[in-house]
A protein has these predicted regions:
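Polytopic membrane enzymes that build or remodel cell-surface glycoconjugates and lipids
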Residues: 1-298, 311-316, 322, 327-332, ...
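C-terminal luminal/periplasmic domains and tails of membrane-associated envelope-modifying transferases
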Residues: 251-256, 264-517
Length: 517
């Protein structure tokens, strides 16, 4: 009873399985009690305390527990529709799931490395052969045909009951049953029933060796699928480490109370913005004294109109993460963009407003991930890196146990540090970083990352170097011509290019088209 109670409170997805306990009790008692009346009485007696626990849990969950994302008002039950939805889920979690297992690991669209494909193939082949022989060695006796047939039907009915019961809490909460992330987590309660159903299907194969070989093949395929899933998460974790390290280079110290805004572009398909909220807090607040978070991280499209009321200045921001809370204001915001192969960028309305001039046609091969999503444009005026990022903190060391050692310094290191120096107008440092990077030689994947170096060279009188970088950048991505035009026009208006502006006209002639400033 204690274990059952802990299970109910520990993982509410599973409470529907508690409804199937009478079926297990019935199968266990049937051989010893031939009388139907006695069986019903015995099952009722044994199940009564578990039913009391279940009813008590449901009362607490629905009427007493208020601090939850899924409020009681969102729960809706339709007796007419419940059977349809429960039955519709069975082919998805059984046949659909196994179809995915067969198709996913070796699909050419997955993009697995040849070495991983070789490992998975070896596991599939060796696992099938070894497991088939191992399973056969476990058979020590033959079950009588008549008894086997009766037992098989019992297990079929029990497996169906388990699958139907598994879907009850999901139906009540109106959760969809899908095989894609993140809804695939709702298939977890079905594991027991689907496994039992598969075992029943395998029992229909009379030839032992064929039955065991097929079972071994399915188990081996499941193993390769788990390896594939582990590789997906490993790759995404490496990408998160890359994100974190570039953020640390660009912002070695962020003022507490800062809200970071970004946009979900599918770079991290298995993480949401809440995961990055805690990543940022673990890095910049290594010894929190309270449950109040000093930083938060929002995807604009997911939070706008909710925790993020508007994109106007002076709006209060509050987010309850259950285990911690954040209180901030739209007056203290950093706008971030991360879309590999481009480096991470903390956007500045002074330097980045012109990037939005570039077209964003997804069919344009020159664009891809190299421009900013339109949703960031409205938030750009709120971003204020000058006030909320420390000018210099080279001693910043995020926890190694979490983020690992600093990786080898590549192009993005020099870009992030140059962008940090540009933030405070340290143009000499920007040129020094550029000289080192270009002499290695490093080059950006995103032409927009030439901008700080072009501006620094121009401001320090190295006009030819600035012009050369402009030509290289535009040659790599002609769609950004207007962005570079805007940079040169701004420099000319500040008098950086001299009184005659002859150099500006030369640049404009090369670029071919420049909008009127």
């Amino acid at each position: 009873l204690i274990i059952s109670l802990l299970s109910l409170f520990g993982l509410e997805y599973l409470f529907g399985l508690e409804l199937t306990r009478p079926f297990f009790l019935w199968l266990a008692i049937s051989p010893t009690l031939p009388s139907l009346k006695e069986r019903i009485k015995k099952v009722s007696l044994f199940y009564a305390p578990y039913l009391a626990l279940l009813l008590g849990y449901l009362y607490w969950r629905i009427f007493l527990y208020k601090s939850t994302i899924y409020a009681v008002g969102e729960i809706s039950i339709s007796v007419a529709g419940i059977w349809t939805q429960l039955w519709d889920a069975i082919p998805i979690v059984s046949l659909g799931a196994w179809q995915k297992v067969f198709m996913q690991p070796f699909s050419p669209e997955i993009g697995l490395s040849p070495r991983l494909v070789l490992v998975m193939g070896a596991i599939l082949l060796a696992g099938t052969l070894l497991l088939a022989n191992f399973l056969k060695s476990l058979v020590t006796y033959e079950v009588e045909a008549s008894k086997k047939k009766k037992t098989d039907w019992d297990w079929l009915l029990l497996s169906l009951a388990l699958m139907l019961g598994a879907g009850v809490p999901l139906y009540i909460a109106n959760f969809p049953i899908k095989l894609t992330f993140p809804e695939d987590r709702f298939t977890f309660p079905y594991i027991f029933g689907v496994s039992m159903f598969l075992t029943w299907l395998l029992s229909l194969i009379k030839n032992e060796m064929q039955r065991f070989t097929l079972a071994a093949l399915l188990i081996s395929l499941a193993i390769t699928t788990h390896i594939h899933n582990a590789d997906i998460y490993r790759s995404e974790w490496r990408l998160q480490q890359l994100f974190a390290q570039q953020l640390f280079w660009r912002a070695p110290n962020i003022t507490p109370g800062t809200l970071i805004l970004a946009e979900d572009e599918g770079v991290f398909p298995h993480n949401d913005d809440e995961a990055f909220s805690f990543l940022v807090n673990w890095a910049y607040d290594t010894e929190p004294a309270t449950s109040e978070l000093k930083y938060d991280y929002f995807y604009i499209s997911g939070r706008l109109g909710e925790e993020l009321p508007t994109l106007e200045k002076g709006e209060p921001v509050y987010k309850d993460h259950l285990s911690a809370t954040f209180t901030g204001n739209t007056n203290q915001i950093l706008l971030l963009h991360f879309s590999p192969p481009s480096c991470l960028r903390i956007l500045d309305p002074i330097y980045d407003k012109d990037v939005f001039i570039a077209p964003r046609d997804i069919e344009n091969p020159n664009m891809g991930t190299l421009t900013l999503p339109r949703v960031l444009e409205a938030a750009l005026p709120l971003s204020n890196p000058r006030d909320f990022i420390a000018k210099n903190n080279d001693d910043f060391n995020p926890p190694i146990w979490l983020f690992g050692e600093e990786p080898e310094r590549s192009w993005c290191y020099y870009f992030e540090k140059a962008d940090l120096a540009r933030q405070v107008g340290d143009w000499e440092k920007v040129t020094k970083l550029g000289d080192i990077a270009f002499n290695i030689p490093y080059a950006p994947a995103d032409s927009a990352e030439y901008l700080p170096f072009i501006e620094a060279y121009a401001r320090l009188g190295r006009h030819e170097d600035a012009q050369l970088l402009t030509e290289i950048a535009v040659d790599k991505n002609p769609a950004l011509r207007t962005t570079f035009c805007s940079l040169w026009q701004r420099l000319a208006m500040e008098g950086i290019l001299g009184k005659s502006n002859a150099f500006l006209y030369e640049i404009q002639d090369f670029l071919g088209y420049c909008p009127t400033p």
